[in-house]
Amino acid sequence: MSAIVVTDQYIEYFNNPSGVIQGAIGSALAAGSVVGSAVAGPISDKIGRRDSILFACLFWLIGTSVQVACQNYGQLIAGRVLNGFTVGITSSQVPVYLAEIAKAEKRGSIVIIQQLAIEFGILIMYFIGYGCASIEGPASFRTAWGTQFIPCVFLIIGLPFLPRSPRWLAKVGRDKEAIETLANIQANGNVDDPLVVAEWEEILTVMRAENEAGRGWKKFFANGMWKRTLAGMSVQAWQVSCVPVLLQGSLS
């Protein structure tokens, strides 16, 4: 978005929006992300990791459509809120899904690749914004926003061909399907392979531990867990408060 809001075409079409309006447009994505993050867990538990990502993609298509066709600030903000809702779901469920369908020895590297892909996608969008700046009129920013359809469509097409999470299948009582999925991932379909048996036992052990531990927000702060909770929360806080601020300050 930052590559678009400084273009003459955007400024002219939206009549040189004030700082408050620009702030609302910029923060709309984060607002939607908060809602998406809050509902991601219940949705994922209900329909599974894979289908929750597919569900989020539908909101991305709607949000992008609203942005491309927007005629005023309100519509643009609404479109970005919908896109943010998608970001909130996918940012939490994609790493979980990848970890649960990957072989144990490759989980770390696969999750890292996913994060690198996000950064690479951001870089591509900057170049797209730069390239579209040469287009005359509103087609400039509408074209840039329209490219957001492309990765989403590929994801929607490809997701049905990917397996469901074995851990989610076990959680909802679909044990046979979970074991078969594990076998396809770990041992080319051999359900008696030692790796498959060990992974299945691990899943059952974790599920029993979760059931015995119970649920509730108090768990995040009881028995010294507040330190781990604070550490996890601070990662995102430091990320958005340090380097981005330094870069923005040095470029302004």
Summary of predicted features, one role per range:
Residues 185-198:
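Short intracellular "coupling" helices and adjacent cytoplasmic loop segments at the cytosolic face
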